[in-house]
């Protein structure tokens, strides 16, 4: 042990490194640090609240969005599903959490999944383009129940394969997807969208109202603008960085496979 000689009140004390460590530890406050004030609506610290970007009056489309959310998504600090829920009237965006659906705890979900107007937004092999559907009100089309899987791509895929009830739903996919406007976050590939962007774009197609998308993206624009003004930088997708040979990390087999499936640029 290393010994240290400390003089206190004209007396010399011999202290080992362990003694010093315990003395320093005793100076640490037992009380937890004060938490930052949080917004009562979005639950984020007030300084980084994105609620000013929400519509002044919550939107009330005829269709509704059903989010099947992986439990791990709740821990993500920059998740966008709450933006979707807070931008729509109560009952127009319902969230169920789990890794398999439906379960007994998911009250009312089984009935929704059995509804003939319920559709799933998921790129399964037989999925058709969402814009091929009649918008609400066209040819007597009733309001849709739009099911979204919320999580990383591996998590969403796991939810789908663990939930046989989802196999029975009509599956659709977005085509001609615009670039993500979530510019402070790195997306896996070009064409990947956040949950908010996916829901907003899909809902605007089903409702036949393109203005819905612009209004619903308000909180995302507000968040990105704030972060960029305070030191954040614009992110490109992993796919873009890899193609430009500027991605700083080795890529995994899953992403490499996805990139091989993409069409070559002319």
Show where each model-derived region lies:
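Short Cys/His-rich Zn2+-coordinating modules
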Residues: 16-33
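C-terminal folded domains that constitute the principal catalytic or ligand-binding module
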Residues: 145, 153-266
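S-adenosyl-L-methionine/SAH cofactor-binding core of RNA-modifying enzymes
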Residues: 89-161, 165
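Short metal-coordination and nucleic-acid-contact micro-motifs, chiefly zinc-binding Cys/His arrays
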Residues: 35, 45, 61
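Histidine-anchored nucleotide/phosphate-binding helix
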Residues: 52, 76-87
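Short cysteine-rich clusters marking metal-coordination/redox-active sites
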Residues: 39-42
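Short Cys/His-rich local motifs and their 1-3 flanking residues in nucleic-acid-associated proteins
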Residues: 44-47, 51
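N-terminal amphipathic/basic-hydrophobic helices that include classical n-h-c signal peptides
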Residues: 1-14
């Amino acid at each position: 042990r290393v010994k240290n000689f400390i003089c206190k009140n004209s007396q010399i004390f011999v202290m080992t490194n362990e003694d010093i460590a315990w003395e320093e530890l005793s100076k640490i406050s037992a009380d937890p640090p004060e938490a930052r004030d949080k917004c009562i609506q979005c639950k984020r610290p007030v300084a980084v609240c994105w609620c000013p970007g929400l519509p002044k009056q919550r939107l009330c489309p005829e269709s509704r969005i059903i989010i099947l959310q992986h439990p791990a998504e709740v821990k993500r600090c920059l998740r966008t599903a709450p933006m979707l829920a807070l931008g729509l009237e109560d009952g127009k965006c319902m969230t169920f959490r789990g890794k398999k659906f439906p379960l007994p705890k998911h009250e009312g979900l089984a009935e929704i999944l059995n509804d003939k107007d319920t559709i799933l937004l998921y790129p399964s092999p037989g999925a058709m383009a969402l814009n091929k559907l009649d918008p609400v009100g066209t040819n007597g089309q009733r309001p849709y129940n739009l099911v979204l899987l919320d999580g990383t791509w591996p998590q969403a895929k796991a939810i789908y394969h663990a939930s046989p009830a989802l196999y029975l739903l009509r599956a659709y996919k977005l085509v001609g997807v615009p670039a993500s406007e979530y510019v402070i976050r790195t997306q896996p590939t070009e064409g990947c969208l956040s949950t908010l962007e996916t829901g907003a774009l899909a809902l605007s197609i089903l409702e036949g109202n393109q203005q819905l998308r612009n209004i619903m993206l308000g909180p995302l624009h507000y968040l990105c603008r704030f972060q960029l003004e305070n030191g954040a930088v614009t992110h490109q997708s992993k796919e873009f960085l890899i193609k430009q040979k500027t991605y700083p990390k080795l890529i995994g087999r899953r992403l490499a496979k996805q990139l091989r499936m993409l069409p070559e640029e002319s």
